[in-house]
A protein has these predicted regions:
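Long, charge-rich alpha-helical interaction segments
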Residues: 27, 32-78, 82-83
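Sequence-structural signature of the catalytic-core scaffold of metal-dependent phosphohydrolases
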Residues: 6-8, 14-15, 67-71, 106
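Terminal (often C-terminal) interaction modules
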Residues: 137-245
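Conserved catalytic core of two-metal-ion nucleotidyltransferases
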Residues: 1-38
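Short acidic (Asp/Glu) and glycine-rich catalytic loops that position anionic groups and cofactors
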Residues: 60-61, 107-110, 173
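Generic detection of long, well-ordered alpha-helical segments
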Residues: 70-81, 101, 122, 126, ...
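Hydrophobic, mid-to-C-terminal alpha-helical segments
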Residues: 74, 84-144
Length: 245
């Protein structure tokens, strides 16, 4: 668990410390409460969120203390974020670049912003994972230029202006989550290399291959049936795959 010194500012904003080097720190403005509210406003559109709320209400009505497995408390969006974080750790460890791995705030923000732009809230975990990673792969064009092709003009979750990367915190316009990308040009290159790798791994309609890849990601030899049930299985549903040409 990371613990940072903090002090209140205004409304839901607080000041957190940012280590510049071994001898210097600076205060920067953060807004974790509003960020959580922003995330929930999008996450709650997914069907699993409604099931969780209904079950919680049922437990309260019965005054039950029975707990559900952690896996139940996940929408498909939350599970995609979880899978990406696990896979990120494995990927950067395998290439011995752990000090350059993409931060969790970027993963959560990008996934949620992409999910916000789609009407496909009924997608199960595997299809939402493929949708999000395919969308993010488009932004790899920005490695060599400042603007995406005209056909992608509506895609703005990652920007590049005057050779500077921008992933803006949705509740704090002063917070560019991609600041470190502008200090180390290898970071965005590794990010898109990782995104392409995970996209390829899960770009399959074969259920056995999908669960094999998922098992490898989580370091488990086998996934039990409950996990498979909540993750969902890959399906060939062309209308639900808007990222395909």
């Amino acid at each position: 668990m990371d613990v940072l010194p903090a002090k209140p500012l205004l409304d839901n904003f607080i000041f957190l410390t940012n280590k510049i080097d071994s001898n210097n720190i600076e205060w920067f403005k953060s807004n974790p409460k509003d960020y959580t509210q922003w995330f929930n406003s999008i996450n709650n559109k997914y069907p699993q969120a409604q099931r969780i709320n209904e079950f919680n209400n049922l437990l309260l009505a019965k005054e039950s203390v029975e707990e559900l497995p952690d896996l139940f408390y996940r929408t498909s969006l939350q599970r995609v974020i979880q899978i990406l974080k696990y896979h990120r750790d494995s990927f950067y460890f395998s290439i011995r670049k752990e000090n350059k791995k993409v931060i969790s705030a970027i993963i959560t923000t990008l996934c949620t912003k992409v999910a916000e732009k789609t009407n496909f809230t009924s997608l199960n975990t595997v299809d939402l994972l493929k949708y999000i990673t395919s969308e993010l792969c488009i932004y790899a064009q920005l490695l060599s230029k400042d603007n995406l092709d005209q056909r992608y003009a509506d895609k703005i979750v990652i920007k590049k202006t005057n050779c500077k990367w921008e992933i803006i915190n949705p509740v704090n316009s002063e917070d560019n989550l991609a600041d470190s990308w502008n200090e180390d040009e290898e970071k965005p290159k590794l990010f898109f290399k990782w995104i392409e790798e995970i996209r390829k791994e899960f770009a399959t309609e074969n259920e056995k291959e999908y669960f094999t890849n998922l098992s490898n990601t989580f370091g488990m030899e086998n996934l039990n049936e409950d996990i498979k049930k909540y993750l969902g299985t890959p399906e060939q549903v062309t209308p639900m795959k808007p990222w395909r040409n």
